[in-house]
């Protein structure tokens, strides 16, 4: 018989809401020390890195996270989108993208932006991101790989096109949608 191990160790951070000098900044520095000494292979940050999502705050968090000794994968939350395309452009300029995909031996990790595009609006995944999700999963989900999908919002409660998202994901072996 097969002796496949599906174990993977990683750290997940979310809603850290760092503003220069606030308590969350201190807590993040402590978390980084812990992560650097634990057996996590990588770190995922699933949104709300900052309070206001200003360029200054985003650069500050990026600088702090530069102390991590492990790869980090980041998606924005509603505090980074600040409910505008220009804020999202700043996020992409600083972090390189608002989505990620990578594989380990047995998993495909995929993170997608589902930020609102109107102040206080529901979360929404853009059509082109749903298409990207479909293409990435179709090409990567081979040999029994399981999908770990990361997004900022609880899917059914706060995502206006959650059914479109589920329609893509349900074709694959999923572990979870959202940690709440």
Model-assigned labels for residue ranges:
Residues 1-60:
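N-terminal active-site segment of His-dependent metallophosphoesterases
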Residues 7-20, 106-116, 148-152:
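Active-site-proximal beta-strand elements of phosphoester/diester hydrolases
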Residues 12-14, 42-48, 72-78, 148-152, ...:
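Active-site neighborhood of phospho(di)ester-bond hydrolases with catalytic His/Asp-centered motifs
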Residues 16-19, 49-52, 78-82, 115-118, ...:
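Solvent-exposed loop/turn segments at secondary-structure junctions
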Residues 55-144, 164-173:
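Extended active-site neighborhood of metal-dependent phosphoesterases/phosphodiesterases
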Residues 140-157:
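Short acidic, glycine-rich surface-loop motifs adjacent to enzyme active sites
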Residues 156-180:
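Long, structured stretches of catalytic cores involved in phosphate-ester chemistry, encompassing
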């Amino acid at each position: 018989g097969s002796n496949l191990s599906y174990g993977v160790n990683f750290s997940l951070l979310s809603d850290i809401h760092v503003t220069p000098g606030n308590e969350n900044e201190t807590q993040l520095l402590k978390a980084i020390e812990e992560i650097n000494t634990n057996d996590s292979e990588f770190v995922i940050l699933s949104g709300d890195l900052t309070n206001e999502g200003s360029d200054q705050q985003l650069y500050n968090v990026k600088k702090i996270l530069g102390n991590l000794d492990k790869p980090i994968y980041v998606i924005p939350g509603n505090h980074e989108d600040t409910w505008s395309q220009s804020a999202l452009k700043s996020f992409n300029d600083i972090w390189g993208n608002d989505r990620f995909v990578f594989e380990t031996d047995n998993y495909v990790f995929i993170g997608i932006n589902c930020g609102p595009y109107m102040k206080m609006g529901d979360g929404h995944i853009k059509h082109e991101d749903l298409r990207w999700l479909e293409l990435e999963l179709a090409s990567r989900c081979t040999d029994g790989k399981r999908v770990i999908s990361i997004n900022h919002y609880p899917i059914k409660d706060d995502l206006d096109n959650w059914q479109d998202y589920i329609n893509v994901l349900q074709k694959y072996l999923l572990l979870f949608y959202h940690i709440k």
